[in-house]
Amino acid sequence: MAGGIKAWPEDERPREKLLRRGAPVLSDAELLALIIRTGDSVTGRSAIDLGRALLQECGDLRTLAGATVSELCAVKGMGTAKATSIKAALEMASRINSERLMICSERFTSPEQVYNHYHYAFRDRRKEYFMALLLDGKNRIMREIQVSEGSLNQSIVHPREVFNPAVRESAAAVILVHNHPTGDPAPSREDLEITRRLREAGDIMGIRVLDHIIIGDGRFTSFVSAGLL
């Protein structure tokens, strides 16, 4: 449809559609258009055109969520302001999911539960993220701690980064969770050594390391299930 969105019939404009019928009826491109807000005068693309171009470039929302600001700006008509608005909106969605997990009163009784709760939060990450889940005596989440970002090594993942918060929260145990951006959840030598050091530190402090879950692409490794912990 030619022309700017304001020239469109009212019932076809994303904002009016949302107000009348609710957000679920909007397409992905229309939702992106509301985040982008304006089109680009140089290319003549409307906000919906830009949303469609982003989806065509990335393929789907999952890939879009993992795109960098620079990659978003590579789409003609996208500038820094539009790209950062998209990144902020997607980050908020990720945090909402994390908050939902944090208030969960369900006990973690299996590695599958941990994976099912966290794989959405980790699957689009292009760097390694290492997280510690602080648990109470009934294995319920008290708090999530992001320990490091980037390639794991012993200087970054230090026992104090895990156990200082655990002591402050009076945690009874911890579960370690991190991702492999390659999609292969097989533990590396560094993973094994870091887990050993954290387990030993936990034993000294009376805070058990219940498991270490490595999240890959659609699969995971549990150190306990694999006999590594």
Curated annotation (Swiss-Prot):
It comes from the Bacteria. It holds the Pfam family UPF0758_N. A motif (JAMM motif) lies at residues 178-191. Residues 107-229 form the MPN domain. Zn(2+) binds at residues 178, 180, 191. GO terms for biological process: proteolysis. Keywords: Hydrolase, Metal-binding, Metalloprotease, Protease, Zinc. CDD domains: MPN_DUF2466. GO terms for molecular function: metal ion binding; metallopeptidase activity. Belongs to the UPF0758 family. This is UPF0758 protein GSU0386. It comes from Geobacter sulfurreducens (strain ATCC 51573 / DSM 12127 / PCA).
